[in-house]
Amino acid sequence: SDVVKELLKRGYSTLSPNRSELNLCSEDNIRNYILNSNCEAIVHCAAYTQVDKAEDEKDLCIKINATATKHIVKCAKILDIPMIYISTDYVFDGTKDGEYTENDETNPINIYGESKLAGEKYVQEILDKYYIVRTSWVFNINGKNFIETMLRPSKANNQLSIVNDQIGSPTYTKDLSRLLV
């Protein structure tokens, strides 16, 4: 990930477990991995991010975005280390005219937003040392993202149908990584 690359560039050692190394659906696996890792901070980027599919996979979305976050937060508390939690603009309902700030009232309108807000609440309630970063439309040059998703069908059909009532701020992972580190 770009976060790992940025940390390494700045001289930090990192752990970046894949799904087989860190099963976010297993509290025991999370506890064992983190408590035995000797880490000095946690940057929690992992998430269930398929917003539409989350409506059909509610339990899995909540398990990954909320419950796993609670377990990670508990480990950070035990180790007395800071944590950065990557959240989303989906914690808001999108009805405000203008930009949202961290002081605006949250009001998620879907399971994804609800699950990320639940994760935020665990971070705030359990930890003293934390940052919550709400970002949107995250993209990089390699992965699936909104821009690639839109370009693919438009190239194939020379036509594209999308919603016209959504406003967002695309976030490049390299830029975000520099700010996080």
Predicted regions: what they are:
Residues 3, 7:
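Aromatic pocket-lining residues of Rossmann-like dinucleotide-binding sites
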Residues 8-32:
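Adenosine-cofactor binding site in Rossmann-like domains, unifying the SAM/SAH pocket
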Residues 17, 42-46, 83-88, 93, ...:
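SDR active-site strand-loop-helix element
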Residues 27-64:
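NAD(P)H-binding glycine-rich loop region in Rossmannoid oxidoreductase-like domains
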Residues 52-59, 94-98, 143-144:
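Conserved catalytic-core motifs of eukaryotic protein kinase domains, centered on the activation segment
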Residues 56-84:
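NAD(P)-cofactor binding segment of oxidoreductase domains
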Residues 63, 67-71, 91-133, 137-139:
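Catalytic helix-loop patch of NAD(P)-dependent Rossmann-fold dehydrogenases
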Residues 121-181:
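NAD(P)-dependent short-chain dehydrogenase/reductase
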